[in-house]
Curated annotation (Swiss-Prot):
Gene3D superfamilies: Ncd80 complex, Nuf2 subunit. It comes from Cryptococcus neoformans var. neoformans serotype D (strain B-3501A). Component of the NDC80 complex, which consists of at least NDC80, NUF2 and SPC25. Belongs to the NUF2 family. Residues 159-249, 282-431 form a coiled coil. The keyword Coiled coil applies. GO terms for cellular component: Ndc80 complex; nucleus. The lineage of its organism: Eukaryota, Fungi, Dikarya, Basidiomycota, Agaricomycotina. One of its GO terms (biological process) is cell division. It is found in: Nucleus; Chromosome, Centromere, Kinetochore. Keywords: Cell cycle, Cell division, Centromere, Chromosome, Coiled coil, Kinetochore, Mitosis, Nucleus. This is Probable kinetochore protein NUF2. The gene is NUF2. GO terms for molecular function: microtubule binding; protein-containing complex binding. Disulfide bonds: none annotated.
Length: 467
């Protein structure tokens, strides 16, 4: 019964059965030594050797990798023997352990082979396939494994590309995390430095506001002083002109007095009176000159004070410029801080996006593996449906071929009728072409006359036609 089930499953396999020659070529391509007798007349030793090489090539599980777990299990068995049996029966238990060693190794080897067979679409792999191999059975199992190997080679490039992209994204995520940590460290340092410099900044800002208000007051006072200075300068110029004019008058009077003294005195009383008047005028002019000189000295002192104020004002203006420079630097530092915060947020968002993309790629990889398994499951059904569909299409094709012959005859008849109708239409058109041209000429003449009549009536009636 089991052999019949195996034959049915062999006939409905989800993969094509290869010939022994093709299987030998595939094994040679995988660097697995095998001969034709190993496939036509298999033995347990040759079959296990081929399966062991396939496990090592396709799954990376060699015989040496089975040795470690086997020794661990045997050690557990030895621990149980020494725990629940007396120490006198140690040699008997050790002989049992040696007896179990080969059986345990064979069962572990069978488990790996069965896992490979399940992956290749062979669910009925049994111990008899290793202990008592059959040529047809071995050919079926190796055909499934070779199909799996070919499919694996075809999909290895895609898997390697996904793996490479995954490694790149992981590396990029690590770099972004490192950069994010550096930016967070810089941000914390800047925040701490700003917090430490905040009292000084507030004091400097208050001092700047006080200096600014004082500077505004001094600037307004400077404008007033400059205006007053200009007025005093004009007044000083006017007084200097008056002093020069009076000096010229005094010089002329002295010259006149000298010339008068050199003359003969004919009227002493009049001359004395005139001299006393001139002496009084000279004294008054000297008093004016002394007052002008005192006023000029006062103006000079005020000009010196104004010059000192102007120097102080220039110093305050320079201080204002330096304050503005410091304020600009502070604003620039604030802008750089905002830019660093924005960059930090951008890096965090980018890191989150890359992490989400990495998770998405992992989900895509899992979905691709699940999809591959589903495709392997559905491929068998698709093959059966395809075979049934091919048979149905063949039957339908035969029916359609018969119908096609009938339709071909009808088509030929219709083509002959079409040619006759076309010849009749051509003869009719050539016969009545002159009449059609006359009808068209009369139609266009009547249409132009009607349009002229409508335009004339519109103009005479004063109608406005909106188009």
């Amino acid at each position: 019964m089991s052999q019949q089930n195996r034959r049915v499953q062999q006939n409905t396999a989800a993969f094509p059965l290869l010939t022994a020659h093709d299987i030998l070529e595939c094994l040679a391509a995988l660097d697995i030594p095998a001969q034709m007798e190993d496939l036509t007349k298999p033995t347990a030793q040759s079959t296990q050797s081929i399966y062991g090489s396939l496990l090592e090539v396709l799954m990376g599980a060699s015989i040496n990798s089975i040795e470690g777990p086997k020794q661990a299990l045997l050690g557990m068995m030895e621990y149980k023997v020494l725990s629940f049996r007396s120490m006198k029966r140690t040699q008997i238990n050790l002989s049992r352990q040696e007896m179990y060693s080969d059986t345990l190794q064979f069962m572990m080897f069978f488990k790996h082979c069965r896992r490979l067979a399940l992956l290749c679409g062979i669910p009925d792999f049994a111990i008899s396939d290793l202990a008592r191999p059959d040529a047809n059975r071995l050919r079926k199992v190796l055909s499934g494994i070779m199909n799996f190997a070919k499919f694996r080679d075809e999909r290895m490039q895609t898997q390697a590309r996904f793996q490479e992209n995954l490694q790149k994204h992981q590396k990029k995520a690590v770099d972004l995390r490192r950069k994010t940590e550096e930016l967070e460290t810089q941000f914390q340092e800047i925040t701490a430095r700003n917090a430490a410099e905040r009292p000084q900044s507030e004091q400097a800002q208050k001092r700047n506001e006080l200096l600014k208000s004082e500077l505004l007051e001094l600037n307004s006072q400077r404008l007033k002083e400059v205006q007053e200075y200009e007025e005093l300068k004009k007044e000083r110029q006017t007084l200097l002109e008056q002093v020069n004019h009076n000096n010229r008058i005094v010089t002329q009077l002295e010259l006149q007095i000298g010339s008068a003294k050199s003359r003969l005195v004919q009227s002493p009383d009049r001359i004395k009176r005139h001299i006393s008047e001139m002496s009084f005028a000279i004294q008054s002019e000297k008093a004016k000159l002394a007052s002008f000189q005192q006023k000029a000295r006062e103006l000079t002192n005020r000009l010196e004070v104004i010059g000192a104020l102007e120097v102080d004002l220039r110093g305050l203006i320079d201080l204002e410029h330096s304050i503005q420079d410091q304020r600009a630097k502070t604003e620039e530092a604030k802008r750089s801080k905002s830019a660093l915060e924005a960059r930090l947020e951008g890096r965090q968002i980018e890191s989150q996006g890359l992490a989400a993309k990495l998770e998405q790629l992992q989900r895509q990889l899992q979905n691709a593996s699940h999809k591959l398994a589903r495709q392997e499951e559905t491929r068998k059904g698709m093959r059966e449906r395809g075979a049934r569909r091919i048979d149905e299409l063949k039957a339908e094709y035969k029916v359609r071929a018969r119908e096609r012959g009938e339709w071909q005859k009808q088509r030929d008849d219709l083509l002959a009728e079409q040619k006759e109708l076309e010849s009749e239409m051509a003869a009719f058109v050539t016969k009545h072409e002159n009449e059609i041209n006359e009808f068209l000429h009369a139609y266009w003449t009547m249409r132009r006359q009607a349009e002229d009549y409508m335009n004339t009536m519109t103009v005479k009636l004063g109608l406005q036609v909106q188009l």
